């Protein structure tokens, strides 16, 4: 926990101070530029009728209640606290890994909360991560099929956009220790890939982009990533991919159209559309133009690439 980590920092600073005073050639007084303390993994606590701590492995659920498996004795559920051997609110990592796999455990621990916050362990959470991994595996099978189909080249850049946005987001979130956001990025990219994977993407483009995605997710779910890389015969040149900024430029964006502060429609137009061009689009739209009929425009509030609010009387 935090207190434990701070003690290590205190000892380290003491040693560095002592060394710097005893050795004129040694002039490093601060051992670390910063300290990031991680949260704890927490679990519900349980006591039997004799007020003894009991382990989750000793319990079963019957009629919606927790009871001891061997004796049938009722169990009192206590607050969720950091896992400790004394309170027996631990889980057996070997059993969890055997049942769900190491990648599911990694996914769950990272996805539940920011790393500086406590993680609440739950069977539902680990099961949800396991099911998401199964979805990723099904998607992998679809991608393999599309690679084997060997489609001809096309000018569609949707896959490049998804891949480069993913690389940029993951890289930033790793550098910022925002590991829970990485899992959100993974869910978003999974949804995007599922939508475009049947668009007959050429083999070379599909392999190259999928390779980059697998490299980027390797710190999170390494076993899954390595297995998929082998399936597309990628065994070398596994450097962290660089972002190609040209694919992050959005040609069309959404503009919010408001009248007197109320949103009436969201329209799509080219990036950097001017106020006058946006006003022309509004007048060309029959429904939006109704808000202008027989009314005077008193004021226009225009925020580039975001919204226009037309004040009328």
What are these regions (language model features)?
Residues 1, 45-102, 116-127, 246-248, ...:
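Conserved phosphate-binding loops in nucleotide/dinucleotide-binding enzymes
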Residues 2-8:
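Acyl activation and transfer enzymes in specialized metabolism, enriched
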Residues 7, 88-89, 208-209:
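Short, glycine/acidic-rich beta->alpha junctions
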Residues 9, 13-23:
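Alpha-helical support elements that line or immediately flank enzyme active sites
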Residues 10, 24-31, 95-268, 302-304:
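Helix-rich, typically C-terminal accessory recognition domains appended to large enzymatic cores
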Residues 36-37, 269:
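A secondary-structure boundary/capping signal
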Residues 37-47, 218:
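Short, conserved secondary-structure transition motifs
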Residues 147, 255-313:
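NTP/phosphate- and nucleic-acid-binding module
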């Amino acid at each position: 926990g935090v207190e434990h980590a701070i003690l290590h920092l205190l000892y380290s600073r003491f040693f560095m101070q002592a060394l710097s005073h005893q050795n004129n050639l040694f002039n490093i007084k601060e051992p670390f530029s910063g300290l990031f303390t991680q949260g704890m993994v927490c679990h519900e606590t349980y006591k039997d009728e004799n007020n003894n701590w009991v382990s989750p492995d000793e319990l079963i659920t019957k009629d919606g209640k927790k009871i001891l498996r061997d004796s049938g004795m009722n169990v009192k559920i206590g607050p969720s606290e950091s896992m400790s051997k004394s309170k027996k609110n631990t889980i057996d990592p070997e059993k969890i890994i055997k049942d769900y796999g190491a990648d599911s455990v990694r996914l769950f621990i990272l996805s539940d909360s920011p790393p500086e916050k406590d993680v609440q362990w739950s069977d539902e959470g680990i099961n949800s991560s396991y099911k998401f991994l199964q979805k990723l595996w099904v998607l992998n099978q679809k991608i393999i099929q599309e690679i084997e189909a060997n489609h001809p080249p096309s000018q569609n850049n949707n896959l490049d956009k998804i891949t480069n946005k993913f690389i940029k987001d993951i890289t930033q979130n790793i550098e910022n220790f925002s590991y829970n956001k990485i899992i959100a990025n993974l869910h978003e990219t999974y949804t995007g890939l599922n939508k475009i994977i049947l668009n007959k993407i050429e083999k070379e483009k599909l392999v190259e982009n999928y390779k980059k995605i697998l490299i980027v997710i390797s710190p999170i779910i390494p076993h899954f990533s390595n297995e998929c890389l082998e399936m597309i015969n990628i065994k070398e040149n596994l450097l962290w991919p660089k972002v190609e900024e040209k694919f992050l430029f959005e040609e069309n964006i959404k503009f919010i159209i408001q009248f007197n502060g109320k949103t009436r429609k969201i329209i799509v137009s080219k990036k950097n559309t001017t106020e006058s061009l946006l006003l022309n689009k509004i007048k060309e739209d029959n429904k939006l133009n109704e808000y202008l009929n027989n009314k005077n425009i008193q004021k226009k509030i225009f925020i580039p690439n975001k919204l226009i609010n037309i004040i009328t009387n």
